[in-house]
Amino acid sequence: MTLKDFTDEWQNNEPTVLVHTSGSTGKPKPLRVEKLRMEASARITCAFLGLKRGDTALLCMPLDYIAGKMMVVRSLVCGLHLTTVEPSGHPLRGLKEAPVFAAMVPLQVYNSMQVEEERALLRQIRHLIIGGGAGSSELAAELKHFPNAVWSTYGMTETLSHIALRRLSGEDATDWYEPFEGVKVSLDEAGCLVIDAPAVCAKTLVTNDIAEIATDGCHFRIRGRRDNVICSGGIKLQIEEIEAHLQPFVNSQFLITKRP
């Protein structure tokens, strides 16, 4: 999809936009989402980050999925100046100056950090949000020393990108996500995160993410996927947590899985 394709769809008289889920938890599926809810999501993100009219934003994600579409909507709704580049593993290549706001996936961030000029630009982006999958602990450790505001996002297509952010850089770096205003979270019987975000999602959403909610009843952190739980001797073990503990002692790529 081109930028013109999406802006034409956005400006037509239909109240909804067609999006597709990423397929990370199954086969990608089409989904109709309301433009008014996309506008609400855009305003919430811009308000949380303190973005203002005239700030520059970078579109380096495919417009076939919600992450790219929402960058355009944020620019249209909040008056951001949007710069577009072809989606690639090196989104900052060829740019003369850093945007105020950008959204990337972990691989784009990692690749940019390997090139001196791109790494310098990456450190100058005032607000960098990273979504589309979990980054490595090594990447997080490097980002912690960045002078700008780097955030990990939590959300999915059904929540119109993200409903919570957590800081990855600076003294405020944390494992705990902070939900946006109006978003409530809880756990179901299996310990999976339940999201109530009426501004962006009409129905309460039960995820497959095993989570922990802080004592304030608001902040939360993700332990791993429900289908990555191993029951050993009556004790439930989260594969992602085991991998995180072992990673400093293993000098190669590895994974832990259930015994067939």
Question: For each predicted feature, which ranges?
Answer:
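Gly/Ser/Thr-rich phosphate-binding loop
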Residues: 115-170
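Conserved AMP-binding A3 loop
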Residues: 16-43, 50-52
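Conserved pre-ATP/AMP-binding loop-to-beta segment of ANL
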Residues: 3-20, 53-56
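Conserved ATP-binding loop and adjacent catalytic segment of the adenylate-forming AMP-binding
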Residues: 148-190, 197-204
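Active-site glycine-centered loops adjacent to acidic/histidine catalytic or metal-binding residues
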Residues: 24, 132, 155, 209, ...
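Conserved S/T- and glycine-rich ATP-binding loop of Class I adenylate-forming
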Residues: 21-24, 57, 72, 102-103, ...
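AMP-binding/adenylate-forming
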Residues: 33-40, 56-111
